[in-house]
Amino acid sequence: MQQPPHARIAALVDGDDAAVRARRLRAFEQAFVLIVVAEYWLRAIPKWGLLGRHYDVLLGVSTVAGAAILAVPRLRRPGFAALALAHLVLLWSEFPSSGNHAYLETYVCLLAVLLRPDDPDESLLELRALRWLAVIVLFFSGVQKLAHGYWVNGEYLVFSLGSETYRTLLGWTLPADELARIARMSGEVGDGPYRVASMLLLVLANGTWLAEIALAPALVWRRTRTVALVGALLLIAGIELVAREVFFGLVFASLLLLFAHGDRQSAARWLVAAALVVLALSRLGVLPEVTYY
C-alpha cells in the first residue's frame, strides 16, 4: 500500500537506526534537560535577585522537573510538561527580548510530552519530528539572513565587530584603521556606515547563510547526510565560537547528532555534561571568566 504524501515526506529523514532509536532518544532528552536546567541556573547566578519573583519560581519548577525527568522515568511526561509551561511563561514575561532558542526548546519539550521513546511508533515519529525541526531551523536561519539583507553586504558582522568577542576572533579580517572606526561607533542613530571593503569579511558573511541553506537539504538526502552533518556541526561551532550563544549551540548540536549513524547521543550527553560543568565553574569564578549567553 502506497504511503500518503505527508508520510513519504516525513520519512525522508529516516535512517538505519531502528535498533537504537529508543536509546538515542532517551540520551538526547537527558542531554537536553541538562542544558535547559543549567541555562536557568547559569542565567540566574550573575543576576541573583534581579530577574523578578517569577524567575525564582521558574528556576524552582525547571530544577524539580529536570530532576524528575532524569531520575524517575514514569515522571518523564509531566516533567517535560512542567518545563514547557515554565518556558511559555518565560517567553510571555520577557517578550520580545527572549532568545529565539527558547522557542526551539519549548517545541522540543512539547514533542517529549506528546511522544514516548519506548513506543516503536511514537519513537519513530519523535525522531522524525526532531530531525525535521533541525532541518527547518537551519534552512530558515539562512533564509532569514538573506531576507533581512544585513549579511549580503556584511553589515551585521561589521556591526557585531563593535563587541569584544567578535573583534577578538574576526578583527583580523579588517585593516586596523577600519577596525578602529567600527570600535568608535556605538550603534546609535546616525552611526555608520557599517560597510567595509574587506572581501574576506564578505565571504564569511555570505558563506554563512549560503551554508545554512545548502546544508539543510543535504541533511535530508542520505547520500550527503554524513558530509552535511560534519559541515553543519563545524558551522555551528564556528558561529558559537564568535556569538557565544552556547545554550542554543548545545541544543542544536544535539539535534544535529540525531542524524548520525548509530547511537552518538549516549556519548554526547557526557560531553554536554562536561561542557556545562566548565561553564558553571567559569560563572562561579572557579575557572577564568568566559563570556557566554
Mark where each language-model region is.
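Alpha-helical membrane-anchoring segments
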Residues: 2-293
